[in-house]
Amino acid sequence: QDVLKISYVGYTAKEVKVGNRKVLAIDLSEDAQALEEVVVTAYGTGQKKASMVGSVQAIRPAELKVPSTNLSNSFAGRLSGVVAVQRTGRPGADGSDFWIRGISTLSEATSPLIIIDGVQVSSADLNALDPEVIDGFSILKDATATAMYGTRGANGVMIVTTKSGQNLDKPIINFRVEGQISQPTKTPKFVDGATYMELFNEAVKNDGSPDVLYSQDKINGTRMKLNPYVFPDVNWYDEMFNDVAFNEKVNFNIRGGGKKIDYFSSISVNHESGMLKNRSKDFFSYNNNIDVMRYAFQNNINAYLSKSSKLSVRLNVQLRDLREPNRGIDDIFADAMNSSPVEAPVFYEPDGTTNHVKWGTTDRLITAYQGNPVAQLTTGYNDTFESTVIAALEFEQKLDFLTKGLRFKALGTFKNWSK
């Protein structure tokens, strides 16, 4: 039988079998769990969603634990009104650009304001945050919710709080290991060298181009595979790219404490690799593939000085080591896609007994995309090391003796970034 599913925000979804009925009377019950859900407000405090006036949306941390190397890719498509666009798959730079309810300002600053534990951070800092350390994740969308931040919150606000310790008899230890495989959804297909030359000659004749035509001897020699040095036939894409790439991620965290002090500590190691074949190992001692190692440390400590006083220390350290080829990845891909397959072999053997006559000569001009892309790929590498330290010291004093619920909070923050 056909089943009709009815759902609405704040109500429990219900499925009803239609059968032969033409009129259905359906009652939805309120979703108490959704209405009781606590969201983090602009003041950094928790408030039940049912009592909220402004437009605020929270996402459960468990929903962010998906196979992704960046947090922005994890919440993409999971938050209404948030548009996320991933512009590249390059390791180390594959985070998404995101906007809350579109672009609301005319200035260059179109990204939302991001607050982690009371500290304003960049989208790169957000991407480096491990989902295992997140305790609350809220999006403030409209002017009512973001009023506290003034013009800084014109593009919306993302507020993230990290986990704290708990008064436990025994500490809680978590260990998580992830393995990921990256693979292109579609790869280009190329014709063989002889077909390439025949199509090239036909295009030159039709276009009236002054380019030199390939000789029939070269076409025949390439088709018969007589000599790979004189008649090369190279699929540069296959020579430069692997079919898959493997990424690994490990997180270890511990949570515990007592009545006076509680703590939460986490360490994450994330390894990403690109899809370039390591051709430099045939000639040099380095790896020409893109390789990213990221380390993240999160330490939160709360000290309860009295029944009404609390001192909190939060420290986040991010380290990143990026190694990549000298030549930009966009240029490398363009070389593989556009270079002629018949102008040069991948490499020449170091044999001078024939004075390299066996390699032949070219009767064509060597122009753009008619060189050796593998040679361009192995011209060297860049190694970039970045470190970010974010620290926060917070003191909170309850003033219930003046007015119940009144609190005084002082927050000092520090951030240092080096490259």
Give the residues covered by each predicted segment.
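Short, small/polar-rich motifs associated with maturation and membrane association
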Residues: 1-297, 311
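Catalytic cores of large soluble enzymes that bind and process phosphate-bearing ligands
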Residues: 63, 67, 88, 242, ...
